[in-house]
């Protein structure tokens, strides 16, 4: 195990794209598994495979290319540059990734109207993301080396994916919906068995 752990940073430097994409996809998929666990009931591995498919084919790759593009367009870690990167990420990258998630999941689930979830949940989810992602990316752009940025985003996306997958399955894209669900679940777990 120790040798694997030491080899991982070398792989990220030598093969940054596949290493970052696979790590991102694994963490994003784990977020879906966590939200299923929180909801209770049997695990839906087909759903987790769909999330993993979308994370590997789009999200991990998009984030890898997008973060490198931002670094090329706005190089450095000066405060103004970092703020410009965060602004670009939240006004361009965020909406693209969020739209791809809702539409991609609808396609993979075989829904008739692949844009319905996007239409119903985009704005609420985007606003919820604005309470999380600017702070994540502020840290990312100012402290994390370029070759680790997608992996760091994936680590932070673990929490986001938990929320996002819940919203796609049964929420409305607001943080309030998940808190209400968790409160109800806690109350039902505490109620005496009949």
Curated annotation (Swiss-Prot):
InterPro entries named in the record: Mpv17_PMP22
Spans through the membrane: 15-34, 51-67, 92-110, 151-168
UniProtKB keywords: Cytoplasm, Membrane, Peroxisome, Transmembrane, Transmembrane helix
A single cellular component GO annotation: peroxisome
Tissue distribution: Isoform 1 and isoform 3 are expressed in the kidney (at protein level). Isoform 1 is expressed in the kidney, spleen, heart, brain, lung and liver. Isoform 3 is expressed in the kidney. Isoform 1 and isoform 3 expression increase during development, reache their highest level in adulthood and decrease with aging.
GO biological process, one term: negative regulation of hydrogen peroxide biosynthetic process
Region described as Targeting to peroxisomes: spans on this chain: 16-55
Lumenal side: 35-50, 111-150
Membrane topology (Cytoplasmic): 1-14, 68-91, 169-194
Pfam families: Mpv17_PMP22
Entry similarity comment: Belongs to the peroxisomal membrane protein PXMP2/4 family.
Protein name: Mpv17-like protein
